[in-house]
C-alpha cells in the first residue's frame, strides 16, 4: 500500500520546522541520538535565543537557497514549487506564531514573508522571485549561487 502524503509535502524538499531549525548543528549540546536526521524531530527542546540567532545565520550561509515562510502559507508553497521546477532543492524554514523573536536578525519584517536568501544574500520576497523568473534572471542567479550545476 502506498503511504498517504501530507499536503504541501514533497520527498524532494527538506522542510525545516521552525521549532527545531536551530538543532541543525548540535554544537551547543551533545546529541543522544545517533541518527543524522535527529534535528527534524519536533520534540526537541529549544536552545537559548542567542544560539537561535547564530544558528539561523548558519542555515542561510551554509545553503544555496533558503526560503523563510509562515507555517502553512500558500505563498511559501508557491515559492518552493517555483524553485523546484528549476531543479533547486531549497531549505524551507517554516515560522510559526510561537517563533516570534527567533528570526528577527534574518527576517526584519514578518509581514513580507516568504523571503528568499540565495547564495547567502537576501534575494527578496515572492514578487522579486517571480520578476526574476519572468525576466530570465533567476537561472543565472541560481547558477552563480551554486544551486544549479547545469
From Swiss-Prot:
GO BP annotation list: defense response to fungus; negative regulation of transcription by RNA polymerase II; response to cytokinin; response to photooxidative stress
Coiled-coil regions listed in the entry: none
Function: May only reduce GSH-thiol disulfides, but not protein disulfides.
Binding site for [2Fe-2S] cluster: 73
Keyword Metal-binding: yes
One Gene Ontology term, aspect cellular component: cytoplasm
Motif, Responsive for interaction with TGA factors: chain positions: 147-150
Source organism superkingdom: Eukaryota
Region of interest: Disordered: 30-52
UniProt name for this protein: Monothiol glutaredoxin-S13
Amino acid at each position: 500500500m502506498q503511504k498517504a502524503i501530507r499536503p504541501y509535502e514533497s520527498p524532494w524538499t527538506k522542510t525545516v520546522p521552525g521549532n527545531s531549525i536551530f538543532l541543525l548543528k548540535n554544537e551547543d549540546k551533545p546529541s543522544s541520538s545517533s541518527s543524522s536526521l535527529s534535528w527534524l524531530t519536533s520534540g526537541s527542546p529549544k536552545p537559548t535565543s542567542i544560539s537561535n540567532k547564530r544558528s539561523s545565520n548558519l542555515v542561510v550561509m551554509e545553503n544555496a537557497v533558503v526560503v523563510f515562510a509562515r507555517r502553512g502559507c500558500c505563498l511559501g508553497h508557491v515559492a518552493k514549487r517555483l524553485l523546484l521546477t528549476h531543479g533547486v532543492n531549497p531549505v524551507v524554514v517554516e515560522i510559526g506564531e510561537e517563533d516570534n523573536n527567533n528570526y528577527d536578525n534574518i527576517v526584519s519584517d514578518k509581514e513580507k514573508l516568504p523571503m528568499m536568501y540565495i547564495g547567502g544574500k537576501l534575494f527578496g520576497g515572492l514578487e522579486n522571485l517571480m520578476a526574476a523568473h519572468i525576466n530570465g534572471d533567476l537561472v543565472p542567479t541560481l547558477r552563480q549561487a551554486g544551486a544549479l550545476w547545469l
